[in-house]
Amino acid sequence: MPGNLLAYYKLKLAKSVSKTVSALLCKCVAPEDNDGDRYLQFNNNCNFIYIYVVK
């Protein structure tokens, strides 16, 4: 039983890491707006980050 439990937690950890990586990759690719520009905006408490994506 301990082996199965260890495998379960390894699988759970791998799934959470893959979800985090895929979420970060999706945030890096911004959709185009009406002007054809790509940009991302993040508002993290007091920090405002504006990223312009060059094509």
Curated annotation (Swiss-Prot):
Tell me the superkingdom of the source.
Answer: Viruses
**InterPro entries xref list:** AcMNPV_Orf72
This protein is called what? Uncharacterized 6.3 kDa protein
Which organism's genome codes for this protein?
A: Orgyia pseudotsugata multicapsid polyhedrosis virus (OpMNPV)
